Amino acid sequence: YKAVSEDGLYASFAQVIERVGNTRLKVYLYHIPPVAQVPIGFGLIERLRRDFPQTVVGIKDSSGDAANTAELIRRFPELAVFPGAESYLLSALRQGAAGCISATANINAAGIAKLIASRDAPDADSLQQQIAQVRRIVQSYPMIPALKGMLAQALNDPRWRNIRPPLEALDEARMRKLQSELDAVGFRLVARPASAAA
């Protein structure tokens, strides 16, 4: 849907919450205006929090706008706010973000987790720079094919390269270029198959 009103969005969320009718339901909103073309605005969040405070408990902010994330944290301290990318994660953490929900966590979970755990450490700014470099490189390629290609290489499992159209897998030359760029910043994905992790 495009060009929907705040009232319409509110009614949509309220209807689902009321029909489920279970206090165990927890809703995490997803603000991704570049893709959805329907923002989750502050007014809508205020209304949902007012009427469903035990249900609407968090938001993933994929606006790519650090100022928007900061304002969400400031306005809604009781809401778990998650930036949708790690590009400005340290700043968001220091302002009160709950963590990060990022596509590149599929390949850089260790780096992101290390930053979250070390947000107050002397090397936190350096850790932020490292994870931001990895993010910049990976997002300069078609993101999902790049991530799946890297997982295929790391796990030695070509099934990870399977992509549904209209997306297309990266060819070997582009995968080598991606790996070379990541090598240049000291990043190497080390992954274990699920059976080895147990």
Listing of model-derived features with the role each one plays in the protein:
Residues 65, 85-88:
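A generic "binding-loop/recognition-motif" signal
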Residues 56, 82, 97-100:
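Short glycine/serine/threonine-biased micro-segments
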Residues 87-198:
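Structured C-terminal cap/extension of enzyme domains
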Residues 1-80:
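Glycine/proline-rich, positively charged
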